[in-house]
């Protein structure tokens, strides 16, 4: 068992913004920033067709399926539902309502479906890089993970004509944040689930230098993946109720007459899961509910990142700082202070 060197500074930030989060100052005085992510992974999952040792086991209609060292045709077809039918059902719904999406696109998957990639681009949805493969990187060697990142970005750039500006691995490794910083050029990294607001993370790169990286947190709770987990959603009403409760709490927290602490809410979607007819109704109900409220900013993740950089720019560390990015000295003022990042580890 490998133990962390206790003589080194503790590398986790358990405090964050603490009791005084910064005022997000969302556009048009919105009380909440709401962001929908569509994960596109079908065709890049574990498969012997892709050179993997066994078939996929994660996020499908099957409960705890065994890995097969051969093609698993049932598992393949469950994934194919997402790329053949589910994705179009979700896309049509957002197009009908003229609402934006961020697509977490796995490059191998998008490469296999050029019509869909073109549709994402034509509809103005952001395509963030979700890696080259949709596999677990926890135990993959660093050189291979770095190469997968390079290939993923290269393919996505070739497919869309634009370099991806957002990153999300999902099943990441201890070195993922560092490798993202090594490549540079990303406006945000979303491999984090521990806050309701974006924040600046100081990442030590492989060459020893430190770079500020904006983190736009993602979610595993307001996420349709819980339809495929043991403690998750059994039916669409469970999903709708959980999303509604999450929205209501955050919308209330953003009330200028109350706490006046606007937050962000991410909704995670998967084509093969939420794209099923029996679950789609819950999404429609939630969208109806959200659109009955006036002070909601529905946006893409890149929009949140750019807003945050303008409203809460990164400040270099101060000698007496703690290393944690917190609001400036007057969080109660009407102006939005920049974030003060101390000199400690992040």
Residue ranges of predicted features:
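Catalytic alpha-helical scaffold of carbohydrate-active enzymes acting on polysaccharides/glycoconjugates
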Residues: 2-214, 240-267, 273-333
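A structural motif
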Residues: 207-227
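Binuclear metal-dependent hydrolase catalytic cores centered on His/Asp/Glu-rich metal-binding motifs
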Residues: 222-242
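A cross-taxon signal for low-complexity, glycine/charged-rich
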Residues: 328-339, 343-346
